[in-house]
């Protein structure tokens, strides 16, 4: 759904959404100038999350005069409300903050102190692999679903993938897997902050986040069909990146790694 309503034709879809909103708030309720100021965001659909009003109660409340939408930048708070950069003031008895979120900066370790070969883990030194592993971090897998569609769609195929890896390791008497990029992956450029239309809470932590690329399997995809193809129908193990080993081999000074097609 996200691919249909946002990514492929962002300009056209933004125009469509604005037209739909305008049809719900006719000119007798709001002038063109006011509507364009408050209902024409600087970002495209899905660059920031959409809000839905299934019963149309949001627009009915505006037409009834019970609600008002103001799009601006907060300059500061005072004892009576909110001061905006435009110079406008909004009086408020109660302010419910919906911004100011802070994402974890050491994904996916959060507050855990992790070291690999006596070196501290730093997120922005590692590529994400298939959306569920990190380069040079052995025996680590994590499950993260989709944000714009059902979380479990991605979670399920990721869990199935890990199950196949563990079964393979049991069969081959292996006890370690690790992803190696061999210095061959080009990082996706991080957006210029002045041009980035992402939510502020993602901008604040972008430089501390893991690296990703346009090259599969180091790309981050949000399409179930593409992910399912990558996980289930491609050469999952013998792809040149995921390596396996046995501690018994290493203890015997046998530096063999094993890869196989699943």
Task: Explain the meaning of each model-derived region.
Residues 1-262:
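N-terminal FAD-binding dinucleotide-binding subdomain shared by FAD-dependent oxidases/monooxygenases
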